[in-house]
């Protein structure tokens, strides 16, 4: 399989140091990048589906699940660009609001609209209302990425942050909504496209999904790193420019440029197989 990877993913997995590391990085990269392909869709079971996936990398302490954290760097430039866009829009909003307050007594001015909070990576410890608000501000697109599964499980157990039902619905791109009577708040996201990447120990999985009856169980892909004895050289390089962090930051910049070109192509639709041994028929709408 690995010899048939697209060039970019091939570059990504070439930075691995072991078989488990390679597998973790590949599946982690696929999940993180899936949230960026919101213009790609297909039909499965007569319903429109998108590439989004939920992943939980499971391993005991010190077994290498930390490799997943490198995959976040692949989408970090896109997330950073969205944050910078939000800051600019917020500054423009404040200036427009200041002008509105000063001139509303004499001129017929329209009150400025508060800008959306643009981001790609959503903090897992967000409240339920904040999570839905951020999704709404970003056209239903978002990535939950946490290197410790407890961050999400503790949030879902709280009164303010229980959005487990939202995650279950978002997996199938169903409409999600929230209403708060106290603040007369209503938020609705019609077509959520959410990806989730988590890492943790088996116990952290049990805290997030206490039993098989929990709907989250069937939504997640679980990659389990088995216990192995051995020691590897953690001082293989002392050159910061050759560190995995630096390598993945460069790959993130590269993907950011690839992504800009990709989204310009419009909606990409995968149609059904025309015969058993044929390739997928791909069309650009």
Residue ranges of each PLM-predicted region?
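Phosphate-handling catalytic cores of nucleic-acid transaction enzymes
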Residues: 1-285
């Amino acid at each position: 399989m690995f010899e048939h990877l697209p060039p970019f993913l091939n570059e990504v997995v070439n930075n691995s140091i072991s078989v488990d590391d390679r597998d973790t990085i590949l599946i982690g990269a696929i999940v993180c990048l899936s949230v960026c392909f919101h213009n790609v869709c297909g039909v499965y079971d007569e319903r429109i589906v998108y590439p989004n996936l939920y992943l939980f990398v499971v391993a005991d302490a010190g077994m290498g699940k930390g490799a997943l954290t490198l995959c976040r760097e692949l989408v970090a430039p896109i997330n950073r660009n969205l944050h910078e866009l939000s800051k600019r829009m917020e500054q423009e909003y404040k200036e427009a609001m200041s002008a509105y307050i000063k001139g509303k007594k004499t001129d017929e001015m329209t009150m400025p609209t508060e800008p959306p909070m643009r981001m790609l990576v959503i903090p897992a410890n967000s409240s339920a209302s904040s999570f839905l608000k951020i999704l709404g501000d970003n056209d239903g697109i978002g990535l939950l990425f946490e290197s410790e599964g407890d961050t999400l499980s503790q949030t879902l157990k709280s009164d303010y942050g229980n959005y487990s039902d939202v995650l279950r619905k978002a997996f199938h791109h169903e409409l999600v909504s929230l209403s708060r009577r106290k603040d007369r708040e209503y938020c609705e996201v019609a077509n959520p496209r959410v990806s989730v990447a988590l890492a943790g120990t088996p116990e952290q999985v049990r805290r997030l999904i206490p039993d098989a009856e929990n709907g989250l169980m069937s939504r997640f892909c679980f990659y389990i790193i088995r216990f192995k004895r051995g020691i590897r050289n953690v001082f293989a390089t002392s050159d910061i420019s050759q560190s995995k962090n630096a390598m993945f930051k460069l790959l993130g910049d590269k993907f950011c440029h690839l992504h800009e070109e990709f989204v310009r192509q419009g909606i990409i639709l995968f149609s059904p197989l025309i015969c058993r041994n044929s390739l997928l028929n791909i069309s650009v709408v």
